[in-house]
């Protein structure tokens, strides 16, 4: 090998020159950068580096886990799954070359020793077999010689005595023949014994050779990984063991049967009798004498199916599935379905049925029914509450209702001396506002409801939670639709009404007109003999505000409103929404008791501990008494507006009740699903022709979601339907955007915005996202989108009328009508009608239009022309030709 310099070697092995010089110095070879390096010096350096750094790892351990599932059959035809984990570990040891050579030499020596032992064993076996065969042959030869001498002596005796006695000779011949046969049989037996000995010797030698080979493979071969499936191998072993067991049983049975046939058992032998009896009993249990039943007979049961029907006590809750009912009655689901079909009800095995239907089916099938009350836990939680006995007077809860823009919020705004209305989008109220006001005569709690038509359900909730309704009517506008609706809500809730005639300061105000209109709906003023107080007010000027408050307090005094102030609180959710920083927030109006910070509350489907309470001004409060509205934080989710709020003792039980209510709501919803009836079949067949506007709706509060959903669903027509794919409270999330993309829906955000992840999905999928803050605009735009889906209306518009004055014959067009245009314009290639005595006799197309032998496109009023009608020759003088065109009119939703 050619010597290289230290610098070149460093470049070749990709290391620095200084490091390589240092390594040479450590190895005892002083070098500089320009010195040459020989092959011997390279080997010396390599050996030094190996000693310093060592080699790779001497031992490597591999671990492997295999997880699988084994299905084990259980009782009742059900099977359970067992998780099985097989762990394998293998260690590889790296040996040095000297150790490897030594082990190879030892293995070679061991193999040679085993081969020598095998050969010696074979030689020994052969030698023993040969010696035994020689001994047998020598003994046989001696026996043959003795037999021969005996035969010769017998023959001599026979010859000597032949003349004397023929009868003796015959007997001797017979005897000799028998002796020959016995000798032949004996010889054959000896040969068979010798053959068996030789086979035994060969078998011993083969066994020795096989054991030697197994030892060799066991000692030398590396253990291989078991790649077979654990469960397949296990089941194969199980089947083999079962087959061997069956073969042993069959063999024992056959042997016992043959033994019985060969020799009858002794009467006095009790052991043999008991053994035979056991065999017979075992055979009877395992399937008798049938040949097919013998296989696997050891695993069969001796259970006999009961012949009589078993009547059971079946416990049925409020709802139950068909499959669960079948399990409780211990019958197959198909039998329950058949019984329901006999009763006239169609059902599937997973369908939820109500308690009455399940009771009828169970009683029809002969079982006793026990009806279970599932709300026992809920009743127990509700009964375990501290409620004080002494009731005290409380402040009235007043709901301000009326038509939109009649000044409800402005009136309350003046009372509270704040500017709330300016903060509402569009100047209209879209939430329920709850406020309490301290006056000189006492405290009053006000609920401000929306007046827009979309917020019917909100107004209904406000009327149910209130004591007194203040009906605001504009003096210049009179009674309007939402005013009438507010009267209906108040009457339905049985709440007294105080009428505030607002905008009394306007010149066009007419309070008497308002009284007359309200009297038509059962609201009569006191001066007319009615029960309602009428107060003239002006929210702008502040006129009559004190009189209105006095009227409210007077009405409250008449009602004698009282509530328990001490003890656990109960109330109602006025409004709820999801705040990004604070979580679910609910506006609660306390009816009884005192709500404290830290109380555990149960609220519809939700529960939680009150972590914080704020009043309507956003100030933290520690407690809230009757008729006080507060915002509470800490619920598990956003409750539905109108839900009952109850303080309970145990959070665990509150959670159980909330989960039970959720499950019950879901089951009831499934049970109410429409059954497949014949009349629905035709309705479903036409659904494919209906266009759908899919909407994913998110709003800031629960009430707005409810109101907008109701308003949009009411827009549906026979041709276009609005479908709310998803709705909720809070900002637009990625999940909402994905849902809208999957269902081809419009994303609508009412006073909410989309987060960053949702915006990415919206941009990627090019979704239609729209933000609104006023409900008018939202409804108008959805109407416009629905109008675009309506098929246009086709309308025929008459553009010209011509009278036939003469008829000419043309070789090209046939009959050509010479006409005078009497109305409008005649256009070529337009559809026409031929009228005779004002009766349409033909409808077709105008093919040829000429004026003085020239083809023209149109002929105006008062001019003559020739008209050729396509595929029609029966034109007569006096006929009228009506030319029209079809125009499309875009339809809109009113």
UniProtKB/Swiss-Prot annotation:
Residues 402-409 are annotated as: G1. It is found in: Cytoplasm. GTP binds at residues 402-409, 448-452, 502-505. Residues 393-562 form the tr-type G domain. Pfam families: EF-G_D2, GTP_EFTU, GTP_EFTU_D2, IF-2, IF2_assoc, IF2_N. Residues 68-82 have a biased composition (Polar residues). Residues 538-540 are annotated as: G5. Residues 427-431 are annotated as: G2. Residues 47-305 are annotated as: Disordered. The keyword Aminoacyl-tRNA synthetase does not apply. Residues 254-269 have a biased composition (Basic residues). GO terms for cellular component: cytosol. Residues 502-505 are annotated as: G4. Residues 93-159, 166-219, 270-283 have a biased composition (Basic and acidic residues). InterPro entries: DNA-bd_dom_put_sf, EF-G-like_DII, EFTu-like_2, IF2_assoc_dom_bac, IF2_II, IF2_N, P-loop_NTPase, Small_GTP-bd. GO terms for molecular function: GTP binding; GTPase activity; guanosine tetraphosphate binding; translation initiation factor activity. Keywords: Cytoplasm, GTP-binding, Initiation factor, Nucleotide-binding, Protein biosynthesis. Gene3D superfamilies: P-loop containing nucleotide triphosphate hydrolases, Putative DNA-binding domain, N-terminal subdomain of bacterial translation initiation factor IF2, Translation factors, Translation initiation factor IF- 2, domain 3. Residues 448-451 are annotated as: G3. Belongs to the TRAFAC class translation factor GTPase superfamily. Classic translation factor GTPase family. IF-2 subfamily. NCBIfam families: IF-2 (TIGR00487), small_GTP (TIGR00231). One of the essential components for the initiation of protein synthesis. Protects formylmethionyl-tRNA from spontaneous hydrolysis and promotes its binding to the 30S ribosomal subunits. Also involved in the hydrolysis of GTP during the formation of the 70S ribosomal complex. PANTHER family: TR-TYPE G DOMAIN-CONTAINING PROTEIN, TRANSLATION INITIATION FACTOR IF-2-RELATED. This is Translation initiation factor IF-2. It comes from Citrobacter koseri (strain ATCC BAA-895 / CDC 4225-83 / SGSC4696).
């Amino acid at each position: 090998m050619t010597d290289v310099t230290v610098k070149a070697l460093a470049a070749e092995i990709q290391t620095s020159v200084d490091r390589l010089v240092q390594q040479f110095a450590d190895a005892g070879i002083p070098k500089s950068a320009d010195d040459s390096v020989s092959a011997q010096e390279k080997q010396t350096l390599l050996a030094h580096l190996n000693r310093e750094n060592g080699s790779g790892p001497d031992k490597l351990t591999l671990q492997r886990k295999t997880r699988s599932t084994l299905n084990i059959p259980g009782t009742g035809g059900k099977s359970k799954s067992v998780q099985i984990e097989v762990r394998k570990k293998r260690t590889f040891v790296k040996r040095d070359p000297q150790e490897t050579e030594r082990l190879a030499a030892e293995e070679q020596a061991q193999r040679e020793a085993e081969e020598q032992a095998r050969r010696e064993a074979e030689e020994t076996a052969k030698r023993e077999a040969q010696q035994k065969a020689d001994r047998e042959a020598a003994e046989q030869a001696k026996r043959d010689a003795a037999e021969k001498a005996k035969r010769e002596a017998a023959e001599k005796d026979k010859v000597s005595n032949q003349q004397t006695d023929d009868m003796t000779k015959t007997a001797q011949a017979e005897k000799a023949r028998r002796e020959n046969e016995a000798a032949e049989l004996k010889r054959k037996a000896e040969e068979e014994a010798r053959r068996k000995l030789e086979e035994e010797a060969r078998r011993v030698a083969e066994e020795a050779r096989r054991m030697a080979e197994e030892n060799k493979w066991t000692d030398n071969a590396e253990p291989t990984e078991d790649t077979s499936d654990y469960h397949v191998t296990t089941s194969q072993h199980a089947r083999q063991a079962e087959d061997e067991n069956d073969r042993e049983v069959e063999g024992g049975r056959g042997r016992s049967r043959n033994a019985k046939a060969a020799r009858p058992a002794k009467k006095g032998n009790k052991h043999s009798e008991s053994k035979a009896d056991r065999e017979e009993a075992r055979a009877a249990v395992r399937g008798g004498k049938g040949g097919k039943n013998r296989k696997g007979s050891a695993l069969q049961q001796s259970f006999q199916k009961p012949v009589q029907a078993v009547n059971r006590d079946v416990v049925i809750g409020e709802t139950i599935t068909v499959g669960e009912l079948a399990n409780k009655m211990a019958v197959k689901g198909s039998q329950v379905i058949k019984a329901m079909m006999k009763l006239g009800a169609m059902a599937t095995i997973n369908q939820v049925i109500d308690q009455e239907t399940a009771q009828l089916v169970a009683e029809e099938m002969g079982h006793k029914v026990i009806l279970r009350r599932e709300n026992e836990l809920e009743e127990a939680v509700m009964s375990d509450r501290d409620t004080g006995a002494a009731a005290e007077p409380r402040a009235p809860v007043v709901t301000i209702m009326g038509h939109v823009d009649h000044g409800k919020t402005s009136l309350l705004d003046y009372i509270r001396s704040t500017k709330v209305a300016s903060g509402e989008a569009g100047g209209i109220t879209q939430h329920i506002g709850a406020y309490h006001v301290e006056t000189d005569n006492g405290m009053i709690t006000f609920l401000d409801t929306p007046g827009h038509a979309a917020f019917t359900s909100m107004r209904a909730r406000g009327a149910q939670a209130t004591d007194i309704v203040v009906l605001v009517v504009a003096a210049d506008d009179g009674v309007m639709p939402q005013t009438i609706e507010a009267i209906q809500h108040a009457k339905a809730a049985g709440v007294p009404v105080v009428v505030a005639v607002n905008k009394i300061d306007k010149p066009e105000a007419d309070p008497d007109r308002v009284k007359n209109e309200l009297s038509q709906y059962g609201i009569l003023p006191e001066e007319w003999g009615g029960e309602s107080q009428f107060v003239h007010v002006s929210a702008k000027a502040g006129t009559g505000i004190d009189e209105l408050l006095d009227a409210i307090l007077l009405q409250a005094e008449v009602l004698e409103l009282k509530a328990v102030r001490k003890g656990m609180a109960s109330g109602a959710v006025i409004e709820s929404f999801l705040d990004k920083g604070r979580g679910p927030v609910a506006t609660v109006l306390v009816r009884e008791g005192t709500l404290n910070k830290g109380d555990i509350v149960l609220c519809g489907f939700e529960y939680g501990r009150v972590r914080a309470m704020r009043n309507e001004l956003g100030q933290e409060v520690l407690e809230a008494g009757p008729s006080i509205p507060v915002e509470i934080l800490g619920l598990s989710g956003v409750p539905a507006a109108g839900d009952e709020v109850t303080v309970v003792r145990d959070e665990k039980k509150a959670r159980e009740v909330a989960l039970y209510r959720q499950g019950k709501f879901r089951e009831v919803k499934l049970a109410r699903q429409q059954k497949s009836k014949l009349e629905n079949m035709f309705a479903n067949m036409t659904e494919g022709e209906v266009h759908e506007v899919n909407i994913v709706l998110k709003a800031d509060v629960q009430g707005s979601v409810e109101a907008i959903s109701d308003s949009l669903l009411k827009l549906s027509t026979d041709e276009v339907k609005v479908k709310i794919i998803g709705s909720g409270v809070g900002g637009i999330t990625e999940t909402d955007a994905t849902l809208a993309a999957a269902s081809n829906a419009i994303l609508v955000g009412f006073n909410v915005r989309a987060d960053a992840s949702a915006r990415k999905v919206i941009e990627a999928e090019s979704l239609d996202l729209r933000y609104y803050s006023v409900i008018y605009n939202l409804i108008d735009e959805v109407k416009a989108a629905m109008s675009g889906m309506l098929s246009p209306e086709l309308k025929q518009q008459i553009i010209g009328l011509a009278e036939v004055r003469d008829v000419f014959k043309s070789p090209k067009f046939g009959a050509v009508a010479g006409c005078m245009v009497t109305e409008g314009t005649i256009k070529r290639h337009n559809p026409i009608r031929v009228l005779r005595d004002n009766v349409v006799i033909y409808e077709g197309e105008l093919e040829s239009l000429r004026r003085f032998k020239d083809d023209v496109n149109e002929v105006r009023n008062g001019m003559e022309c020739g008209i050729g009608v396509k595929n029609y020759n029966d034109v007569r003088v006096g006929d009228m030709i009506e030319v029209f065109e079809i125009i499309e009119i875009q339809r809109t939703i009113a």
